[in-house]
Every structure is written in structure tokens, then in C-alpha cells.
Amino acid sequence: MVSKFDTQHLLNSNTALVAGVDEAGRGPLAGPVVVAAVVFDPSQPHINGLNDSKQLSPACRERLYAHIVERALAYKVVMIDSTQIDTLNIYQATMLGMRLAVEGVAHVAKSARIDGNRLPKNLPCPAEALVGGDARDPTIMAASILAKVTRDRHMVELHLQYPHYGFDKHKGYGTPAHLAALAEHGPCLEHRQSFAPVRRMLTPKAIHARQSAHQHNENSPTKAAFNMLIERDD
């Protein structure tokens, strides 16, 4: 671990402390989109085995997750839930998550490198978009692992609440088994109603339940912060 003294020394130096940023869960029909940002000391060797999280086994991701958390100067993981995804759309929800993640490490990071070809607005530091960054940049690889492991763990927890859908297996993606469960049971509160396969199976009961959840979300501290961030884009 880097001590507080060592970290402060790095902050006061000209060392390029770059936050790697990536997301997990843009495509699934259920659950949150998760974004992670992580900052390493560039003078230290890279963690062995880092790769795009999609290319790693679950066991390997879990092992690397522990190493990343131990070695990071700072990291932040943000979850944007299905209600916010439906309110914004998945692209804007992902941009919001990226901005919140970068803000969470801005006390350490001097810049950010974000996987993809677009950057969120109003970031707290200079940033660049890197297409294919999760396969090219070790810090983005680490962020992809933090995001993926966090999301997978969350989907296993959701399986305990909604065992009919098999979230622990497919993690919310539109597999044949998931689509069959949707057809049989209809959507739950964790499904993204703005996604066509879910929208086609909506019932009045499901719509009412989401509206109630949305109303509750409107009064939450997270929603207040969310509104403030959106206003800053205007």
C-alpha cells in the first residue's frame, strides 16, 4: 500500500497521475450500469494478468479485483440504477456514471483516460477518450475489472430478491433463458423498461410499480445530486 506521505509526495510532484475509467453493463436488460475509475502510481510495476474484464474468467477477475483495490492510490465505483437509465437513456446514464467516478478520484488524478470515443461534460480534470482502451491501457483494464466484478456481485444479490429470472447466471443480459423468464413472469423493478425486449412485455402492474419507484427516487439524495449534475450541462 502507498502511505499517505507517499501519496502526498506524488500529488506535489510532476508525476502524471491518470485515472483509468470504464463501465460494465450497458447492454443488459436489467440491473445497473456500473462505472469505475482507478488511479495507480505510474512508477510502480503493473499488476500481472490485467486484461479487458470480458477476456477474464470470473475467478481471475475476483483475484485481480483484490490486487487492484490494494494497489490503487484511489478508486471510485458508481452504480446508475435501472430507473435512472430509463429516465435518461443508457448513453446519458453512462456519461453520468463516468463523471461521478472521475469526480470521486479527482483529489488524486491529474487527468483521466476513458474507454470509448466520447467524453462526459464538465469533468473536473483534463481527459481523453481511448477507443479500445480496455484492451490497450492497464489502468482502464483495472477499471473495467472493478466495474465488472461490482456489477456481477450486485446481480447475484438481485437474484436473491428475484429468483425467477436467473440474474446470477446471465447477469441481466438478454439470453434465451432470460427472455423466457420475462415472457413467463413479466418485468420486475430491476428491468430497464426503455429497452425494447422489456417494453414489449410490460403490464399495467409493472408500469405502476416503476412509476411508484420513480416517485420514491425523485425524493432521494441521489436524485438531488443527479439533478444538480444535469443542470450543470445546460
From Swiss-Prot:
The keyword Isomerase appears for this protein: no
Pfam families for this protein: RNase_HII
Cofactor: Mn(2+); Mg(2+)
Keywords (A to Z) from UniProt: Cytoplasm, Endonuclease, Hydrolase, Manganese, Metal-binding, Nuclease
UniProt binding sites for a divalent metal cation: 22-23, 115
Gene Ontology biological process terms in this record: DNA replication, removal of RNA primer; mismatch repair
Major location category of this protein: cytoplasm
Protein name: Ribonuclease HII
Gene coding for it: rnhB
